[in-house]
């Protein structure tokens, strides 16, 4: 598995830690783990030994002047395509992931009559416009990519920039989250109960 942790994201710099989880059937003296986004000119590698079992290798990325991900009304929802690859002897594997680089924070400042409650996206105040989302169908296998596309496109057409996924539903298929990323729509994900 591959996990991207955005440590710091500003218009000037993005620091991302990429944790690559590697299952090895035996001890290996050396494995090369590379994370790259060739179209963006980004690449970093780490060489590490592997032990039999599960290994975690962290590859730091430092990106100057990153193209930030924005909600649809604030800018372009730019997505980087990163490829994480592992090479050890004759064995190799890779995984490609698309992610948007952004900073998002909930602002809770004290004011005269209470506390603020709004989001900042990449340092800009965000007026959240959205809806609660429940599963498109109780029979999940009937929900196709086309159904997800229509649902997300309809939300975008009425200028929504955030969908709250209801906690009494399900964790949606990856295509739901990918389409939201592409369309510049934030997801407020409730935990299931």
Give residue spans per PLM region:
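Secreted/periplasmic carbohydrate-active enzymes, especially glycoside hydrolases
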Residues: 1-163, 171, 182
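Flexible loop residues that form catalytic
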Residues: 168
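Catalytic cores of alpha/beta
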Residues: 177
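Proline-centered loop/turn at the N-terminus of a beta-strand
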Residues: 184-186
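Acidic, His- and aromatic-enriched active-site or binding-groove loops in soluble protein domains
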Residues: 189-193
């Amino acid at each position: 598995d591959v996990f991207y942790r955005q440590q710091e994201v500003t218009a000037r710099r993005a620091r991302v830690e990429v944790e690559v989880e590697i299952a090895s059937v035996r001890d290996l003296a050396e494995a090369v783990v590379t994370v790259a986004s060739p179209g963006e000119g980004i690449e970093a590698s780490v060489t590490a030994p592997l032990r039999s079992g599960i290994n975690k290798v962290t590859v730091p990325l430092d990106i100057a002047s990153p193209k930030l991900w924005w909600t649809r009304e604030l800018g372009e929802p730019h997505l980087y395509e990163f490829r994480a690859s592992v090479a050890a002897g004759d064995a190799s594997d890779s995984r490609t992931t698309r992610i948007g680089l952004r900073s998002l924070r909930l602002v809770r400042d004290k004011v005269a009559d209470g506390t603020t409650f709004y989001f900042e996206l990449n340092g800009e105040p965000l007026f959240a416009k959205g809806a609660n989302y429940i599963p498109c169908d109780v029979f999940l296998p009937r929900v196709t990519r086309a159904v997800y596309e229509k649902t997300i496109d309809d939300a975008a057409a009425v200028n929504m920039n955030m969908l709250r996924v209801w906690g009494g539903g399900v964790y949606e298929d990856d295509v739901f989250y990918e389409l939201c990323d592409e369309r510049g729509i934030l997801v407020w994900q409730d935990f299931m109960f």
